[in-house]
Amino acid sequence: TAVLWKTGKMWFRVPETVKIVLKNRLPEGVFAKDLALWIKGILSKLDVNGLAIEYHGEGVASLSIDDRMTIANISTEMGVVSSAFPPDDRLADYFNEPAVRGVWADEEAVYSRFIEIDLANVFPMVYDTGNNVLQGVEELVGLKIQQGLIGACASGRLEDLRLVSMILEGKHIANGFQLFVVPASRDIYLRAVEEGIIDKI
């Protein structure tokens, strides 16, 4: 702080960058949260604290902006300082701005690590926060669950709520089970109300 006061300047260390290349697309019934946990499982074996991540490859185009935000959100839990996706048509559509532009890595960019992920191999994942263990959903068949949370920062976007309403439509929550649904923002909540999603949930 004293240096900033004295010189009017501040120095920041440019983080090393991990390049993650995504191939193919996620199978039906597998979602961005599963991919985020899959990536978490890979990165947990590496020291990525203080590093940045860039996502490349044709698989990126299959991910919505909400998907990308979910993946970037969970990456911060491992100490990653930033996650970047290329500016593309999906981003332009999201902002309703055909001429949207962004900053992206040049061809000579140097990376500290290179990771390739075939999205077709990703399957539904569960993160056991108590034991810090990632598991496939199939490993937990038969496990009794008393509470569920859908929402907050990692899974409370409009896409998530639409999916939940589709799954729950015409169904009832089991006796003894509590389900909490928390939209990520007031704007998302209001849009969900307008679409009739909240009534279905």
What would you call each of these model-derived segments?
Residues 1-201:
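Fe-S-dependent hydro-lyases/dehydratases of central metabolism
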